[in-house]
Amino acid sequence: MASTTTCTRFTDEYQLFEELGKGAFSVVRRCMKIPTGQEYAAKIINTKKLSARDHQKLEREARICRLLKHPNIVRLHDSISEEGFHYLVFDLVTGGELFEDIVAREYYSEADASHCIQQILESVNHCHLNGIVHRDLKPENLLLASKSKGAAVKLADFGLAIEVQGDQQAWFGFAGTPGYLSPEVLRKDPYGKPVDMWACGVILYILLVGYPPFWDEDQHRLYQQIKAGAYDFPSPEWDTVTPEAKDLINKMLTINPAKRITASEALKHPWICQRSTVASMMHRQETVDCLKKFNARRKLKGAILTTMLATRNFSAAKSLLKKPDGVKINNKANVVTSPKENIPTPALEPQTTVIHNPDGNKESTESSNTTIEDEDVKARKQEIIKVTEQLIEAINNGDFEAYTKICDPGLTAFEPEALGNLVEGMDFHRFYFENALPKINKPIHTIILNPHVHLVGDDAACIAYIRLTQYMDGNGMPKTMQSEETRVWHRRDGKWQNIHFHRSGSPTVPIKPPCIPNGKENFSGGTSLWQNI
């Protein structure tokens, strides 16, 4: 029998040196190409620990990095697969993080910030021209080529980058770093290249004053700020920033992605292309001082989060009851709040709010300068939560057509109204869409409380949650119904379909009775129809 030849090209051609960094499945080490003596950084991935989906991500990252050749992007020189390991050979960048370099400078002005963001925009523009969205622009991924004065800024880490066609907008999953996420990602809307420009706006804001535009200890409140575009230019630090700089930030931090400035447009902005005459040359000592604190906070909280991830007990029951020793956790996930306090909604518009904490713990955003998406797992879980929201919205809207698109024709269900019987198919549910749901004329607000998603391979998932439904009864009094639900999802032809659900507790949405004596509504003790889907 012929023996299989194992590739040893990396081992033969490269010599490894000290460790430069470490990830969950990878380590970065300095290396030298033996024939030339040229030094590089080798990202070494332990492929024995990777799932099939992780392998796809690795291939995508290598494919994207091979495509991008630009002086402001860390370049991939080689991609080699050996038994048990994959090697990505990158530029060796020795200048450290851009933000750390800025605080070590004796002089730093608005014009310097303009030069920094210009290089970042050049890298982003190159990505976008090649159909690549980075999705994780943040200070940790902005490096300097060397320690020399005036060294080029280099964009790094394309682990979350995606490939898009032209100006394609789609839901690519919930990925990024909390303070840099765009409103459309937080709304779980289709998104594309504009998400990178939003992150550039956040970075530029920090470059000018040393602190971020959106900030809150509580992640939910932080996300509300971002979705509302709630930032300002407070005195006195912003009084010395030119109007042109503020104008560029406003154009980058535009809530509507269709109206947000593009990378190529930003490069033509006067504050960028006419820097010498437009940007201020005044030294910004307060910015440097604030940036030092910002950097220290990033590093400290990053270290705490790393420790937590390494030592966390992932038992959901324990984590709901006990905080890890020595770590303060802002655990407000079980508090039900209404989005009406911050975002006005039409009176009769059915709403679905997700208040969740998939792992049972919720760290404060101060510790969350780490990229969301445990390599893609969280994005996939968010996909399941999103499609569950869509299904419940279809129910609230009485939209049977939308409901059937999300559900498998052979949907099976256990629910109180079926009296202990297993219901199969759509006819049982059709009755309620055609006869009960059209009679709803009151506001309905559905809350998915604390959903837990279990992924079963690449194409199946199970979600369990508490479903709260708020409504106004016939007397104008607010009421709330609760049920516990579990739904099983299966992906067919790239689309998720609900194949089974199990609901306990009370039915969810009260419906006006078809016939009420004396024309009086009676939700408190009279007969009522109930939604059963």
Curated annotation (Swiss-Prot):
Keywords: Acetylation, ATP-binding, Calmodulin-binding, Cell membrane, Kinase, Membrane, Nucleotide-binding, Nucleus, Phosphoprotein, Sarcoplasmic reticulum, Serine/threonine-protein kinase, Transferase. Residues 283-292 are annotated as: Autoinhibitory domain. It is a peripheral membrane protein. SUPFAM superfamilies: NTF2-like, Protein kinase-like (PK-like). ATP binds at L20, G21, K22, G23, A24, F25, S26, V27, V28, K43. Its EC number is 2.7.11.17. This is Calcium/calmodulin-dependent protein kinase type II subunit delta. It comes from Rattus norvegicus (Rat). The lineage of its organism: Eukaryota, Metazoa, Chordata, Craniata, Vertebrata. The gene is Camk2d.
